[in-house]
Amino acid sequence: WPAYPGPNGIRSSVCQTKLGCGKKNLATKGVCKAFCLGRKRFWQKCGKNGSSGKGSKICNAVLAHAVEKAGKGLIKVTDMAVAAIIKYAGKK
């Protein structure tokens, strides 16, 4: 189970800063914001040890790792997608 980022670490604004949302291109901002909000909800629900008492289905180590990894991959993928869209749009 990855380390709980802490009450400050799960904040959407902190997450966005860490991921550098919208720095390279503004299109990543929306995707990034949505991801950071989802991540915040995940950690709020799952807490430090990964369960909200009821053993929620979404609170598992695999998902927690995926959530933390996704942030890093997400921006890269969005940047690539935006670049591809711009390239494609320019061809018409």
Swiss-Prot record:
Query: What main location does UniProt list?
Result: secreted
- Cystine pairs: C15-C36, C21-C32, C46-C59
Which is a GO BP term held by this UniProt record? killing of cells of another organism
Record keywords: Cytolysis, Disulfide bond, Hemolysis, Secreted, Toxin
**Can you supply one Gene Ontology CC term for this chain's record?**
extracellular region
Q: Which domain of life is it from?
A: Eukaryota
Identify the tissues in which this protein is expressed.
Localized within the skin and proboscis and are most readily isolated from body mucus secretions.
Give the location in the cell.
Answer: Secreted
> Single GO molecular-function term?
toxin activity
**Family, per entry:** Belongs to the worm cytolysin family.
Q: What this chain does, per the record?
A: Cytolysin that shows hemolytic activity (on bovine erythrocytes, HC(50)=5.75 mg/ml). This hemolytic activity is completely inhibited by small unilamelar vesicles composed of PC/PG, PC/PI and PC/PS in 1:1 molar ratios (with at least 100 mg/ml concentration).
Protein name, please? Parbolysin P7
Its lineage reads: Eukaryota, Metazoa, Spiralia, Lophotrochozoa, Nemertea
